[in-house]
Each structure stands twice: as C-alpha cells, then as structure tokens.
Amino acid sequence: MDRLLNCPNCLKVFNNPRQLECDHILCTRCIEGVYNPGRTPIIKCPVCDKHSIVITSIDKSFPLIHCIEELLTYKYKDCNYDDSLSIPLNNSTGSSNNNNNNNNNNNNNNNNFVINNSNNKNNGATTTTTTTTTTTNSNSNSTKSKVVVNDSSPNLISASPKGLGSSQGSLTTINNQKKLTLSPQRASSTTTTSVNKPPLKLKAISSPPITPNVSTPERCFVINDKNKHVMISSETTIHNVSGLSSISTPIVSDAAIAELSKCNDHDQKKFTIFCTDCDQLLCDECLNNNQQQHENHQLNKIIQEAEKRIGDIESMIITTSLCPNRLINKKNKIEKIIQDSALVLKDTKLKITTDIDTMIENLKERKNALISQIDKEYEEQKLELKDQIETINTTIVDIQNNTSITQGIVSLYLNQVDSEMLSTSLLKKYSDLKRMDQLSDKLSNNLEQNIEWKWEPEYHFPQLFTRSNGEKTTVVYRTKRVSVGVSSSPTGTGSNGTPQQQQQQSANGNPTIITTPPLPPISANSPSPTSSSSSTLIGNIIKRSSPPHLPLSSQNYDNFGSTPPRLTTKLSSPNLSISMPTFPQSNSVQQNGSTSSIMKQQSHGSKLNDNINTNNNNSPSPTSSSTTSTNGSNTKIQLKNPVFGKLLTRKDSVITARRNWIYGFSDHQVEIYDNVTKVWRGGSKIPKKSIEYSSIYDNNCTIYRFGGKETPNDIYCYNVDRDIWEHNKVKIPSKRNAHCSVFDGLRYIYLIGGADRDSSKLLERFDIETQQWTKLASMKFGRSYFNAFYHPTKRCIYVLDGYVNKDKKSSVEMYSLEKNQWSVICEINQPRYLSGVSFDGSKYINIIGGVDRSNSRDIKTMERFDTSTHKWEILNNEPKSLLSHTSSSMNLMVVQSPQLKKNNSFSSISSHSSLNSSSSNNGISGSGGSGGDNEIPTEKMQFFNTSFFDGEQFIFFYGINIDEHGPLLYKFSIKTKKFEKIPIDNTLDLFSTLIFVSK
C-alpha cells in the first residue's frame, strides 16, 4: 500500500499530488520541475511521455487528489497511530497457557484494534513491525496478542483516542469483544516460533481481506479531523461519543455476495475456477461447454486469484474513484459555459437594441437635416429665378424699344431720306442691337447652364450632401452603371449641348465642382450662340464618342448631365504594332475612338447649318438629362437623383477626392503621368515585349493584356494600385493577335477575331470573376485589324471594317448576346483601314479617314452607321477642309467657336480667328470670317493613336507628327479652348497604349 503513496517520479511520499491528463499522479514539485512557462505550456509526463497542457496555471489545470491527501493526513497526524498491524500467533508450545494468562490478567485488552503511534511508548511497552511479536508489559508479565492496522489503509481503522479517560496512550476497550482468528491460508503461512518472517499487512479498501470466520469489531471510533471523511469497515453505525463523528458505511448483504458468486449463464451455478488467460470466472458448466476455448489456458482457484489480485483491485478502486472528479469538472465547465453564454446573449441583445436605436435616431436627424436643406435650397433657387425674371423683363423692354426705334430709322433710310444724322443714328442703333443680341445670348446661355437644369427632376438638389465644414461636395457611386438610351428625332439633324464645368470656391476657399446640365438644341428662335458655341461643339464631339457602357462616378453624376467619354484607340496597319480598342471601366472614364470625332463633327457643320432651323421643337426630357447630336437624335442618360432616386447606403455616400492618372505601356516599362503634379514617373517593367495585343481595364484596378504577336496565348494583368504585373495562369484557348476585345461593364470580356487563320472568326468570352473561358458562336467572316463596340441597350456587339477577305469587301456584323448568334447587317460603302472609328454609345458608329484598301490611297470622306436603321450615311461636305492630307496623314486642327453665318460653317475646322477674338471678348467669339490676320497655326498630328476625356474639362490627344522624332500628347481644355502640350521624355512611342484612370 505504501507504493500507492509514493510519487512515481521522485519515489518520495506525495506532496500535493495532482493528476495529469494522462491519468498519472505526480507531486506538484515534480510537475513544476518539468514545466517551463517561459517557453511552452506543454508538460511532458516523465512516466509515459504523453503531453499535458497548462492553460492558466498548474493549480487550475490539474486537480488535486484529495483521497491521497486524506491518507497522508491520517498517516502523519499528531495522534497516536500505528504504522502497521501486527498479528501475534500462538507458539506451538505453551500457547494455551499464554492465552489463559492473557484472559486472566487483561480480560478487556485481548485481540483489540489499536492505533499505533511509532513516536511514543505505551507504559514502557515496545511495539515492533513484525507480524509475530511478543510485547512485555512492565507492570504485568502477561502477553498480549494485538492486531494493528496500518493507517495507510483508508478503510479498516480502529481508534483509541487520548481523550477517552485512558492513561497515556492506553488502549480503549470496546465492548462485545470478539476473538480474531486467521483464515487457514494465513494461518498456514505464519510461523509459530520464528519472528524473521516478513510482516503480513492486511490490504482492504471496502472490506477486510479476511475470510468470513474472522470476527470484525462491531464499532470503531475515529477522531473527526477537519471534517474529512474516512471509510470504515464496520457492520454498525458509530454514534457521536464525546465529540466524535458517527460514520456509516454501506453494508453488502450476504444475499448480494451470494448472487455475485453465481453464474448468470448457467442456472445460477457457483463459480468454481478462474481462467487467467481469459480473465474471467468460470463455473463447471462454462468449463464443460467451452473446453476448446479454454484449452491450454491456465486455470487457478478463485481464492488464490483473489489473494493475488487484491493489490490491483485496490489500485483500480483508487483509479476509478478519480473518474467522478473528472466528470464533475467537465460538468462544472459545461454549466459555466451555459452561464457565460446567457450573459453574452444578454449583452448582445442589449448591444443590438442600442445600435439599432442609435441608427434610427441618426436617420431621423438625417431626414430632418435633408428636409431643411431642401427647403433652404428651394427658397434660394426661387429667389435666384425671380432675380433672373426681373433681368429678363428689363432686357426684353430694352430690346423692344431699340428694335422699334431701329425699325423707324431703317424705314426712313430706305425711303431715300439721306441725312448724315440719320446714318449716324442707324449705325448707332445697329451697335446697340448687336450689344443687345450678345447680352441676350449671354443671358440665355447663363440661364440654360446655371438655372434651368436645376429644376429638372433628374437634377433637383444635386448638392445635398455636404462635408462637415459645410463645403458642397459630390456623392460617389462606386459600382453603379447606367445604360445609354437613344431617342430619334423626327425632324432630322440638329445641334446638341454639352455639360460645362465651372470651378467655384467654397466659403473656406476649397474648390468645389459645380456642374451644369446638357444644353438644349438650338432652335430657329434661339439666339445665335456666343461663347458657349465652342463648348457645344466639344460637347457634341464628346457625346458622339461616349462609351458604350459608362459607369457612374462622383464626377459623372454631379459634374455631367451626359456621359463624359474617354477615348482610347490605336490606328493600325498590317506592318505596324497596334493596340486594339479598349472600353470604359468603373473608375476611369475610358472609351474607344479617336480625334476623328472632332473632324466628323466639323465635316458635318455645313449640313448642320442647313438644318439648324428644323429642331426648334426639340427640348430636353423632363425626366432625364438629354443631349441632341448633330443627327437630330436625343441621347438620354437615365440618372437617378441621390435622394429621391435611391436609398443611399454607407458605401454609396462615401465622400472621396478623385485624382487622375495616365498610364502608358511602352515596350519597356509602364509610364505614369500624374495630372496634378504634371510629372511622369516610371512604373514596373513590362514582363514580355509584344505587339498587336489588346488591353482592357476592368471595374476594379486591373488592366488585362490579351494575346499579342509574341504572346498569342498569354494573359498579363497589371495592378494599377500595386504597380505590378502578374502572368495569369489561365491561357487563351486560341492564338490571338491583331484582334479586338470589348467589355460589357459587368464581368465578361469578349475576344473577337485576329490575324491567325484559326482564330480569325472565333468569339470567346472570359469571366473575370471565375477566370474561365467560354466559346461562343463564330463570325461569318474572319477579321483582323478591325474595330468592335458593345451596345449596352441592345446587348449586342458590332464589328466592322478591317481585313475581311481577298475581294477587299468589308461588312458590318452584329452579335446578339441573348441569342448567341451572328448576323451580317450590311457592307461598308468604302472599305478602309487606318481609319478613325468611334461609337457614340447610343446610336451612331462613325468612320473617318483612313486608307482605301483597293488602291491604298487616302480617303477624304466620313461615313456614319445608324445602329437603329442599319443604314450608312456619307458625310462628305467640304472634305478638303475636313482632312488636310499630306502623305497618309490626318491633321488635327483646333476646334474653336465658329460663327453661324453663311461664310463660316462648322466644316471650317482650321483655327481661324476665333481664338484671338474669343480672348479679346472675354470668351465671346468675334464675327471674323475666315480669320485673316487672326489665324493661329496649330500642331499637326498623323496616325492618331489615343483620345480620351478626363471627365472634367480636358480632352487628351496622343499621336505622332511626321516632323517630330517622338510621339505627341496634347491636352485640350473645353473651358479655355486652348491646347497644352504635355512633354514626353520617357520610353513611350507611337504605338504605346495610353489608358486614363480616375480614382
């Protein structure tokens, strides 16, 4: 039993024993010896090498074994205890005499259970640790036969407390004494004459290992030590005597013992033998029926096996007694988790309720603030309108008076009334009428640009959202996209207006973008345009080059009544490196096209003059921002008001400052131009040089480069935020170069055609989210070096021009995304290449210039394809003024504000006189004819590469001049009507790709 009280690691008596997760019990100091809290929370058991984890501390992680503590307490307490139980046996001679003497001298002291204290002496008597001993009393010669129980056993303990009236350490006599006799097995194993035998210690936990013929005491007393429970083997209950505790133990009945000794499988026959190999009890029937099973097995008597295994049984009892403690700990943990979860649930409910209540209060405050702001803006706008009405009334009266007076003077003058005074008055009134005309134009333009548009439903209160300092700002729509609709005009062609940008200063000096709506079409009764004419012309150019699918941004929504386009196009030839058109993405207003849109607009100017009086009934739609192009169609952009059109989320209403960059991709590296600092800086290196690839910008921050002559199956991705290139593991299924790619504004990129024979007709779709390819229907004709556009309203793709077949014919094909079907629409009147092709995003595809495929000569005409009627219209009025040809070149002329007079039309696009006259008249063009001395020559470009709009007030043109060694980049301001040259001192060349990014 002593080995159970020793630590298996230090082999000493347990000191604060604790149980590890592997069920081994160690001293606390041994556990601390193998625990290194500074390095690891894992403890390695020195007995079995299994790991245990210390969560917080050793005391909280490993339970203390209380039963061992109790055993140690009773072993080392300061009461008189004996360490062992000695059983003296009668000698073979004189045993009867000794017994008689004992009975005569100490009738009450024979065969008693006593508590041995090894540190004291009782009346001079000496107690030995041998099984057979003879104790001599100094006062009496009698021999006492005693049974002493080792206090290490927690069950069978007899007590003789000091406070019961006996002398120093005297034994307490228990009534109803019963003589103790040993079983035959133990009696035979003892020696009557020798004391050199090892002590026989009784081991018992629940019951003493004594055969039924051994008498046990009916009662035994123990000291109540700090209310610690002690198991006592007794048939009776000990009552409180002089402060002693009464302890009751369960009594196993004889019937239960008899039931356990019978076999349940064979009619309750008694077990007769134990099979050590099978580790089970057997009756005679079990042994007879299963002879083969127990053949060659070792069989043993039940009594001998029980004697052999009593130690294991005791160990198993102790081990099993620990199981409830572990289960109780687990149960307590679960109960604690339930309690903690209830607290967390309560706190979470409270937090949710508080947050939602706070949100409701904030929404109510926001609602009241918006309503107050709307009322305030309404009153301000109403006062402004009243002031304008008074100004208009005054101007009308002045005009009427001057007109009537002038008419009278003209009548006198026509009646041949010749007078110097009359002539002077006539000229004076003529000057007054011109001044009044200019004043009327200025007033009308001011009303259209700054007043009227605010009262259209789409533009009610566009500046509701303000910063904390009260400065007006814009609402950013990061991912919202709109489709561009088309509304045909029944009266033919006309002129359209364009949004104007005005930079105003807020109260604190910070600039705020205040925008204007699209101008209404010019009618016969409207005054001739003045300073706004050039803006209108540029607006037409922008609108006719608008992207096929333009997502909204902060600048798009608040700064433009119509879609601001951005052009990115490369003209190409079979022997030149090209980049096919790229389409607009979310944060960058990007679009296919070239400066041919300007020439197209100018070439159509004379026709516009002839039809300028046919659109007097066209006006902006009250429910949308509308612009009227030169062909007489109204382009409607459905824009929702930020308050009434949709419920803004936190993401939608984020206020951000936007910056613009130009990304150029040369053969060597990425060149980045900051539009604020006006400085070029080098980016990352190009991973692999290639030509004839197509590039496109997605809705996030990635520019895809598909194919190319050197990399026909590769996809390279450039991250504009991280300035890194990545080689996409996904390959293009077919070889692609000299092809086109279009983006639907959502998630799909379409690759069309190419120079390779196997892929010249193929159409494949790339999903930028799943990175998977899908093969779609093929075109009717193979194409390369062509142009393609996506029509968002019809959900179709138009492809036209390029190298189609040997007979030098060119056609227009349309692909329906819903039907997955190609159809040939018509043929192009004049097949060409190296031409400027643009799509206005709604109705017309325009082709200008280029080289005739039949004779390789320059083409001087411009054609326009109507996507609604599928018909071509040739616009060839004054082609010489439209295209100034030197070699195979197209000259870019400054677009100024021409006067609507018979001797000056929109077709005269050379920069005659208007710049000087406009600057001398505060932006109002003079009336000079062809320009004369006021003519200002401009730079000339050939092979226009890229044109795009920055979304505010600048149009960028990228190309080459035959007299220059490097490419040219110009920035044209639609506000000041001036060109500004951006120096290029980097690796860009003519065929580099330029992409505009706004964030």
Swiss-Prot record:
Residue positions binding Zn(2+): C263, H266, C286, H294
Stored InterPro entries: Kelch-typ_b-propeller, Kelch_1, Kelch_domain_containing_8, Znf_B-box, Znf_C3HC4_RING-type, Znf_RING, Znf_RING/FYVE/PHD, Znf_RING_CS
Keyword Repeat: yes
Chain residue ranges for the region called Disordered: 92-147, 159-209, 485-637, 904-936
Gene3D superfamilies: Classic Zinc Finger, Kelch-type beta propeller, Zinc/RING finger domain, C3HC4 (zinc finger)
UniProt keyword terms in alphabetical order: Coiled coil, Kelch repeat, Metal-binding, Repeat, Zinc, Zinc-finger
Biased composition (Low complexity): 92-143, 485-516, 526-536, 613-635, 904-924
Ranges annotated as biased composition (Polar residues): 165-196, 552-612
Name listed for the protein in its UniProt record: RING finger domain and kelch repeat-containing protein DDB_G0271372
Species of provenance: Dictyostelium discoideum
